Regions:
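Nucleotidyltransferase catalytic core that binds NTPs
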Residues: 1-107
């Protein structure tokens, strides 16, 4: 299976992110929208509540049936800080050992 991994703070998740997700949805078997609880390179005091951002991402994906292959992923909420991308990819590869992961950046 081909899996796109689209991670970020999504603070907030906006129409540009949704456009990227729609593009990926048509090109991959699965798209993981990985919401990061805390970007290690940004100050926590400026970020919206992590749980609220995760919930908002889930609600946004649910409102868009054209994003049927998109799954909001909370794996970084289960990991110890700091959540660096390479650690997240290692954890995801352990969950999907026979699949190909593609990291998507930007939006």
């Amino acid at each position: 299976m081909q899996i796109a991994v689209y991670s970020g703070s999504f603070d907030p998740l906006h129409i540009g992110h949704l456009a990227v997700l729609a593009y990926l949805n048509g090109r991959f078997d699965k798209v993981l929208l990985v919401v990061s609880p805390q970007n290690p390179f940004k100050g926590a005091e400026k970020a919206a509540n992590a749980t609220a951002r995760l919930s908002a991402a889930r609600e946004a994906v649910e409102r868009h049936p054209e994003l049927a292959r998109v799954e909001v992923c909370d794996i970084e909420f289960q990991m110890s800080a700091p959540q660096y991308t390479f650690r997240t990819l290692d954890a995801l590869q352990a969950l999907y050992p026979s699949d190909t992961l593609t990291l998507v950046i930007g939006g």
